[in-house]
Amino acid sequence: MKLFDYAPLSLAWREFLQSEFKKPYFLEIEKRYLEALKIPKTIFPKSSNLFYALNLTPPCAVKIILLGQDPYHSTYLENDQELPVAMGLSFSVEKNAPIPPSLKNIFKELHANLGVPVPCCGDLSAWAKRGMLLLNAILSVEKNQAASHQYIGWEAFSDQILMRLFETTAPLIVVLLGKVAQKKIALIPKNKHIIITAPHPSPLSRGFLGSGVFTSVQKAYREVYRKDFDFSL
């Protein structure tokens, strides 16, 4: 069995990234991830959602990139069943999952900046379908073990995704929240794309609330696309 047998990837992205899949680094990622699936430990998100961010936002549709670090590693209960919070999109959670503190702060700042009503669920799929790539730098995680899949090497792949997108002619709006995400500035060609930075939305970080980050995103989106991005959920 190959990686894409467990984790489907759309034809558009397969064609866009075709040259990556035979490179040694990617074959090593594939090997390590498939080995991790064989161990009797729970891996999030479920393998069918591993590439959900890519599948919801084709390369030709990407207008905004909101980069995350790695998936949520926690669970929630629904009908007495333990389910993963992570769904394959950065900062987003399953429809019926409790909204995590970082996402609550995102919604608070969005409301303060643009008056967008605070939603009752944390599923950001609608943003992805409108052109916001919600990509995590690390695509998988072990249950209750933050950053546990850093060893798999996902960042080499997500960096290639970003660099391929940065080669496009249309200006992209790249939103980097926190110091870890902001390290990716080194990958972005100068004077070609719009970079917007802010502190991480975690309550453990300071400065995100009141940063005006979504005001900046909307201003940039208007400049490039002559209309507002629809942040409603």
Swiss-Prot record:
Name of the protein: Uracil-DNA glycosylase
Molecular function in Gene Ontology: uracil DNA N-glycosylase activity
Cross-referenced NCBIfam families: PRK05254.1-1 (NF003588), PRK05254.1-2 (NF003589), PRK05254.1-5 (NF003592), ung (TIGR00628)
Gene3D superfamilies, A to Z: Uracil-DNA glycosylase-like domain
Catalytic residue positions: D70
EC numbers, comma separated: 3.2.2.27
Pfam families: UDG
CC terms in the record's Gene Ontology section: cytoplasm
Locations listed in the record: Cytoplasm
Protein keywords: Cytoplasm, DNA damage, DNA repair, Hydrolase
Purpose: Excises uracil residues from the DNA which can arise as a result of misincorporation of dUMP residues by DNA polymerase or due to deamination of cytosine.
GO biological process: base-excision repair, AP site formation via deaminated base removal
Organism: Helicobacter pylori (strain ATCC 700392 / 26695) (Campylobacter pylori)
SMART domains xref list: UDG (SM00986), UreE_C (SM00987)
Predominant place of localization: cytoplasm
Catalyzed reactions per annotation: Hydrolyzes single-stranded DNA or mismatched double-stranded DNA and polynucleotides, releasing free uracil
Alphabetized PROSITE patterns for the sequence: U_DNA_GLYCOSYLASE
Similarity-based family: Belongs to the uracil-DNA glycosylase (UDG) superfamily. UNG family.
InterPro entries assigned to the protein according to its UniProt record, in alphabetical order: UDG_fam1, Ura-DNA_Glyclase_AS, Uracil-DNA_glycosylase-like, Uracil-DNA_glycosylase-like_sf
